[in-house]
Amino acid sequence: MLPFREITLEDKPMVEHCGSHYNYHLCERCFVDLFMWRSHYNTQICFKDGFMLVKMSPLDGGHDCYLAPVGQGDLGAVLDALEQDAAERGLPFVIVSVAEPMIERIEAVRPGKFTFSHDSEDGDDYIYLAEKLRTLSGKKLQSKRNLVNRFKTAYEGRWSYEDMTRDNIKDAFAFHIHWCNLNGCARERDFEGETCAIVQALHNFDYLNLRGGLLRLDGEVIAFTFGCKATPDMFVVQIEKADHTIQGAYQMINQQFVQRNCNDVEYVNREEDLGLEGLRKAKKSYYPAMRGVKYVATPKG
């Protein structure tokens, strides 16, 4: 078996080195995502012959699965090693979150071996032009501009935005707990997992090179967000929370953060909607420039 183990902070340089050979716009390729959600998905990692290999457990209780190898070297040999690892563990060999360009790479080294399927868009990432999120320009985003302008008018002199720092991280986490209580989800398993992930990210904020922001009204936090630059041209927003009872709060934290923290990228990846109808509607309403489509690869026969 391959020597899979829990991912640690010390893996960050090697993960980023392996990922640098592929400019894939999927959030699963981001070290921050792998690290902060490691307990939730039982994420395990190992390195072999210049490649990063990842094994995860799906939330539906199904068999463990693998991410497609990223790195530089003999991709075919590494795929064979993963298949052997699955066999030795008594697992069906399944590779998830396969980017479209990776399909071409796999086909080049193991032609006709795999079937690639895309059964649901629930896990596909929403990827936007950073400029559009900064300016909210154009007819399609007029409703977003209106909400931002109404917020600024209604709360003139009462609202403020600030970048996340060591001094205000605790305020962001306190708002997360408030948000969970406000939405009646504090005891749900998924949100317990999210709380653990947020703790991991905020506790290691500087080492993970995160950027974040807080929106305040009358001095109290009403929204926060954070993420990281995952590729030379893409920023990934890992978390965004706002008080839904305050109209325009979500739109404000979105725009204010991107205006201040995403000027060095072309794209902003706001991750998937998980099949949640409200989240899907919200993400589609910003009109993504593209979707990060994720395929599943299984051996034929």
What are these regions (language model features)?
Residues 110-189:
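Acyltransferase donor/substrate-recognition loop-hinge adjacent to the catalytic core
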Residues 167-220:
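Short, conserved active-site entrance elements at the starts or edges of catalytic domains
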Residues 92-109, 121-124:
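Short, glycine/charge-rich beta-strand/loop segments that flank catalytic centers
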Residues 102-117, 146, 274-291:
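Conserved active-site alpha-helix within GNAT-family acetyltransferase domains
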